[in-house]
Amino acid sequence: MDEPGGKIEFSPAFMQIEGQFGKGAVMRAGDKPGINDPDVKSTGSLGLDGALGQGGLPRGRVVEIYGPESSGKTTLTLKAIASAQAEGATPAFTDAEHALDPGFASKLGVNVKRLLISQPDTGEQALEIADMLFRSGAVDVIVKDSVAALTPKAEIEGEMGDSHQGLHARLMSQALRNKTANISRWNKLVIFKKQIRMKMGVYGRPETTTGGNALKFYASVRLDIRRMGAMKKSATKSYDWSTRVKVVKNKVAPPFRQAELAIYYGEGIYRGSEPVDLGVKLENVEKSGGWYSYPGRRIGQGKANARQYLRVKPEFPGIFEQGIRGAMAAPHPLGFGERRDVQQESGEPYGNNG
């Protein structure tokens, strides 16, 4: 970009733009803060952090998490909040559904005394409160639960049975047009939870998400979370379930990767076997017969003993996880699934990654 005989920073056009619009109105892409060291927040799952490509959910971006009921959306967002708190961040939770249970959140590791909660009356109020919190610098992460519950004021003040066609979609479109630039400027992370609806009388997959198409376009990361099946703890009762999360859109890393999570009731995402399983998939841990080995030492015979080794060696898990994250940061890490027929499985075509 250098001009002959000098740098563009000293050209009359560049100086005029900065004088009129302020410093930073035009800059080199490589000079933007965080361009080489992305700022991310962990999801609370080592496997999902790897599937996302950069080690977590990117700050300064909008993230959408959608899926059927009881698929683990709330559990995933609360674990992300707990991870953010562990890193010193201050999160906020917009409880538009008025359904958050502080006791359940506490069991998942959330420090409820440090969690800001808002229960707005209207969708406009919810979005304005979030914007004011961002401007104050008081919070780093905001979760909006959920898009379907961000009810427009006109609908609340109207009569039951009144038609408000397109009102919700217009609210989301206007809000994202106005707020996305501020989210990037203030380097905040916004997570929208979305429910799934069924379109009537359509050919093919009838699933769709609420709130129109605006969030699909403005979100940098979209996660499709689906419950796969129950995992039994006893012969008669099922307490836990396995969940698959697909990255159907990703503007900061390669998309279409996936991770499988084990979710325990009252505990959240179970990380006990994640490091060992991922280490084997990423070829960072050697499995020979029944023995698991990490470079330089054996960590156990059988997966249970390997997990126990990580549990009783206080200095080792950090080194072990650091090695796993380093392997996940490779350009083409193994073990996170390939480009599958995302259009058929999640309802999102390949071309919707823009």
Swiss-Prot record:
InterPro entries on file: AAA+_ATPase, DNA_recomb/repair_RecA, DNA_recomb/repair_RecA_CS, P-loop_NTPase, RecA-like_C, RecA-like_N, RecA_ATP-bd, RecA_C_sf
Keywords: ATP-binding, Cytoplasm, DNA damage, DNA recombination, DNA repair, DNA-binding, Nucleotide-binding, SOS response
Subcellular location: Cytoplasm
CDD domains in the record: RecA (cd00983)
UniProt record, GO biological process: DNA recombination; DNA repair; SOS response
GO molecular function, one term: single-stranded DNA binding
Binding positions for ATP per the UniProt entry: G67, P68, E69, S70, S71, G72, K73, T74
Region annotation Disordered: where it falls in the sequence: 28-52, 332-354
Signal sequence interval, chain numbering: none
Pfam families: RecA, RecA_C
One GO CC term, this protein: cytosol
Keyword DNA-binding: yes
Protein's job: Can catalyze the hydrolysis of ATP in the presence of single-stranded DNA, the ATP-dependent uptake of single-stranded DNA by duplex DNA, and the ATP-dependent hybridization of homologous single-stranded DNAs. It interacts with LexA causing its activation and leading to its autocatalytic cleavage.
PANTHER family recorded: MITOCHONDRIAL DNA REPAIR PROTEIN RECA HOMOLOG-RELATED, RECA
Family under the similarity heading: Belongs to the RecA family.
NCBIfam families in the cross-refs: tigrfam_recA
Protein's name according to its UniProt entry: Protein RecA
Taxonomic lineage: Bacteria, Pseudomonadati, Pseudomonadota, Alphaproteobacteria, Acetobacterales
